[in-house]
């Protein structure tokens, strides 16, 4: 053994061969190591390829799912846009109705104010008419009192006339009695044919006749004067009575007209109050409707704000860029 070793050491060929053999062994070991490493790398590449294939499949699945989600989101977005448009149309309609209701309410308030003014003017007119009616009633009462006094005066004149007629009748009765006495005395004188008595009677008869005639003339004059006064008073009374009757008739007609006006004004006042109550109720209902519309509009605005906040996430440029980059990366992986 030592001899062979020494031979190898002495022989350069053997030495070179030995070195080449060792180098070959080292190369074989290094090649085996490289082969092992290559196999390891190949296995790793296979695993990475399988992982890439799986990731590509997952990416494709994700892309498909994202496309479906984006399609659904676009569909929901279109539906939300349609809902928002419908809500805008409804809002415009509500706003228009609200403007109409406000205009109607303003017209109602104007009508109520005009009705209140007309009612106030009707009240003042009623007060004026009542005052005039009271004054006319007072003047009518005064005229009635005056007519009553004139009637009493006329009745007193009639009583006085009746008393004077009765006194005239008594005077005529006395005159007839005196004439009867005279006639009886004359007949007695004729029967007795007493000339002295006849002469005395002839002397006394003219005196008595003259006195009686004077008395009768005075009474007749007084009766004529009383009759003239009675005629004048009767004519004046008839004139006053006719004038008062005309005034009473005019007053009654005016009173009837005033009563009609008062009734008409009361009716207008009742109608005005009824219309005012109706307008107040309409105003209250309009206020309630306006409040409900405001609440509905506020709720719709809040709902639209919530939806817009949810939709703004999809409308943001950063989110769009991230989605675009993700899709590009997935497409690049799928191409590999």
From Swiss-Prot:
Q: Where is this motif: Bipartite nuclear localization signal?
A: 240-261
Under the heading InterPro entries, the entry gives:
NEAP1-4 (IPR049932)
Specify the domain of life of the species encoding this protein: Eukaryota
Q: Does the keyword Transmembrane apply?
A: yes
Residue spans crossing the bilayer = 313-330
Give an example GO cellular component term for this record: nuclear inner membrane
Gene3D superfamilies linked to this entry: 1.20.5.170
The subcellular location is: Nucleus inner membrane; Nucleus, Nucleoplasm
Membrane-topology annotation of the record = Single-pass membrane protein
Key words of the record: Coiled coil, Membrane, Nucleus, Transmembrane, Transmembrane helix
Give the record's subunit note: Forms homomers and heteromers with NEAP1 and NEAP2. Interacts with SUN1 and SUN2.
The name this protein goes by in its record: Nuclear envelope-associated protein 3
Species this protein is from = Arabidopsis thaliana (Mouse-ear cress)
Give the gene that encodes this protein.
Answer: NEAP3
